[in-house]
Amino acid sequence: MEYMSKIAGSSDRKGSIIAILSQMGANFTVQQFEDVENIVVSFNPSNKRLVIGAHWDAYEGSDGANDNASGCSVLLHVVEAILAESAFSKSVDFVFFGEEEKGGIGASRYIESVGKENISAMVNADVCGFGDNILLSDKWNVSNPLFFGLMDESLLTKHKVKLPGFLPQGDDCIFEWGGIPSVSICTAERNAVTVFSEIGHKISTDQPITEQDQVALMSLEVVKTMHGGEFDNISYLSGAAVKMVADYLTDGLLNV
């Protein structure tokens, strides 16, 4: 909870992330554009890099604890684990994106600056601090080697990752629309697995999303942790949820 609390409780979220990275001894750069700033931690830069991202900005009027100090905390824990390794050879950019809540501006600027031809795939960590289930929108990427083992079936099974076929849009969609394979990961309560799976099935079979589906979606507890909802407060969140996702990503990057 420490990282999540420092980010969610700060009036300078970007500055808090920079302070944490500096304290752990990570090398990072701040991408400064006219309309957004990103923070990038690069390991072994190449033209076949995997991007693991989380947006650092918050919805106006929200403290942005679950959306998305939790995802930023996941990235910080994984970076910390990699720094503790004597050797890490995979090419990975950990990117803290700005202005996701304004249409994924930070993700768009990052792709423009790096070049989509130099990005192999993208993992988006968004809303990772509530519930006891890991949900991953795989977008037909199970077993895709571009994800450096993170999408291996054995790893997904080991960490009990659920594949509902649908999660709400985030920065992953900016990469997907650019032709870059992408997945999104979050945590949620058990009922969310059912609701997201039902919506995912309808999308994949070209069935309409009904008003009843929308009501079921908006009634989920995890949805209420976002955008000024009933549970949009860090007191409702769990460090254990963040750890689940961080452990899955760390295991995939270091041990697969």
Model-predicted segments: where are they?
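N-terminal capping segment at the start of a domain
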Residues: 1-12, 18, 57, 219-235
